[in-house]
Amino acid sequence: SPLAHVEAKVFDQVIDINIKSTWRLIRSVEPLLLKSDAGRALVLSSSVAHTARAFWGPYAASKAALEVLVRVWAEEQEKTALKVNSVDPGGTRTAMRARAFPGEDPATLPKPAEVAEKLIKLCTPDLDVTGKLFKVREDRFVDYRLPE
């Protein structure tokens, strides 16, 4: 829907799912992750966090806010062993994707399990990257900071 036409309850639901639930999860799991000498946290984002795609307002805004939340958490853990990163899985064969792109051939997209396989290496003790965005399709981390 156009941004001005989104119902308040729909907007609130998107914010609750993508931001508040992650914040609550952070509050719950952080003590456990900090007890580990190799705590790792990955938070799923979306490419729409970086684009102003028409009719995606609440979702895009929530994913952009989510990425900032994750970067703040990573900065707060800078002096700990905990590594925190966001993940942009790229187009993935999900029910949400099918609803958003009904004419798209799902066979052209990876299944969630295939995406998850690529994330395993981000959870290993030897990972030393934190506060970045991992783009699954490009198989690389990108930095958020713009060149000065």
Could you tell me what each predicted segment is?
Residues 1, 82, 88-100:
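Short beta-loop-alpha junction of Rossmann-like oxidoreductase domains
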Residues 1-3, 7-12:
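Substrate-binding pocket helix/loop in short-chain dehydrogenase/reductase
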Residues 26-27, 71:
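A short, exposed helix-loop element centered on a Lys and neighboring polar residues
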Residues 1, 28-37:
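A short helix-coil junction within the Rossmann-fold of NAD(P)-dependent oxidoreductases
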Residues 86-87, 94, 102-145:
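C-terminal helical subdomain
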Residues 8, 34, 40-65, 70-79, ...:
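Catalytic loop of short-chain dehydrogenase/reductase
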